[in-house]
Amino acid sequence: MKTDIEIAQAAEIQPITKIAEKIGLSFDDIELYGKYKAKIPLEVLEKFDEQNDGKLVLVTSINPTPAGEGKSTVTVGLADAFARQDKNVMVALREPSLGPVMGIKGGAAGGGFAQVLPMEDINLHFTGDIHAITTANNAISAFLDNSLHQGNPLNIDPRRIIWKRVLDLNDRALRHVTIGLGGPLNGVPREDGFDITVASEIMAVLCLATSISDLKERLARIVIAQNYDRKPVSVGDLGVQGAIAMLLKDALKPNLVQTIEGTPALIHGGPFANIAHGCNSVLATKTALKLADIVITEAGFGADLGGEKFLDIKTRQLGKQPDAVVIVATLRALKMHGGVDKKELTSENVEAVKKGFANLERHIKNMQSYGLPVIVAINQFASDTESEISTLKELTEALGVSVSLTQVFAKGGEGGLDLAEKLSAMLQAKPDFRYLYELNQPLSVKLDKVVTEIYGGSKVNLSPKAKRQMREIEENGWNNLPVCMAKTQYSFSDQANLLAAPEGFEVTVRELIPKIGAGFIVALLGDVMTMPGLPKNPAALKMDVTDDGKISGLF
């Protein structure tokens, strides 16, 4: 079979004006970025404001293997399947971060015959949104250090600055740096560090903002440091929220592209799900809901991370909950949770599937606890056997949950027709949605509910630092914000090697970081890196561009 990039380059891509017409947008409703990409101005959302919202389908997954389980691929293929059934459908996805693309993933725009196009552009610089976020983030750092240099009128304690610079690359050497060296003319010496851009609070702010005015208000609330009295210092205290919003003016607009089969796709924003909330922008999802009858969207990593955050964080800003949830499962991941070594995942092992099913079962019950109908999509791989597939189907159906075998990687929309048909029936009913916790509950209760009811743990322990931070959060009146758990994606717990569905474990919250602009409190569990490193053999080693500009090596 051809590689992803070979399939993408051989596909017949339509002018973006044609794609816009499919969802009722005229030439004047879009801003062109070349022939195959466009931005949708915020006024368009206002224009369709009276339109009823379409149905919203959330695609999530079980705890993945390091290779991922094809959640984006299933999301794209499902949208194409609905389009084949003449449904007015759109897909809404996050945009890839360049760091992981050049590090491990090699690309993140779907796979096989279920991709979004232009694949090379989307995986690289796209419309420049992430670069704008990088600039906005680092501008705040520059203004902060200038304030220190110019007499420190805000009385900022340089030892208590929490705002870091960012870069959209995996670069472990920049995690901890010292700046301001070289004498008085070069600023105030202090410790600093770099995060990857998609871990920046600016990314989360952009993805949760609903307008330019909301963007400015959120930017102003971002806490960047403490002063010598241990009081918070914000971007608003620097007085630069207007300038930062100006830098993000165009990045706030959703990006319109297409799938291989010509289904309209909005790709906008890309916060990590193991660090931030892991969902595409509220504005993109809102826009899609006004323009389409069915919207397929995804949340990063498993249902314990991106799925939980979509439901407890994003829906509160979106003003709408999903009408159904698709949980993507693969037999290789279930076998991994069943104790099979990563090198043996392609060998048949029915007993391991049965043992690893505990992971999928917990995810199913978790999503059902929100009052949402659930269907399992088996993302089929060539190594899957009939015995393994039938075993997984039997186990899933025994829970009263529908299951569909999908082959969208190999067949595109055709391989998702069964999933689309089963979902169509599920979408007729209105779910009785309920949140995991209420915002007015104490932060300790919210943490406990996520850990005990979603993860299956028994207790939350706070480090001395986290205890102090919780007191500060309460003193500052930030207790009514949702929690955003930052942990490993491979396990329900905070330990990557605790697979399947562990019980009775305790988790330790190392830090509680207030992200007041985004509107949530990040709880750091375990050893989560906000600036990844490159592997021994980065995916970039296989990437190249020919003399005529043709790209190779993305996958």
From Swiss-Prot:
Q: Which GO terms describe its molecular function?
A: ATP binding; formate-tetrahydrofolate ligase activity
Q: Which GO terms describe its biological process?
A: tetrahydrofolate interconversion
Give the family, as the similarity comment puts it: Belongs to the formate--tetrahydrofolate ligase family.
Q: What class of enzyme is it?
A: ligase
Pfam families in UniProt: FTHFS
Instruction: Tell me which EC number(s) this protein carries.
Output: 6.3.4.3
State which gene encodes it.
fhs
Q: From the Swiss-Prot or TrEMBL record, give the protein name.
A: Formate--tetrahydrofolate ligase
Which SUPFAM superfamilies is this protein grouped with? Answer: P-loop containing nucleoside triphosphate hydrolases (SSF52540)
Q: Where does ATP bind?
A: T65, P66, A67, G68, E69, G70, K71, S72
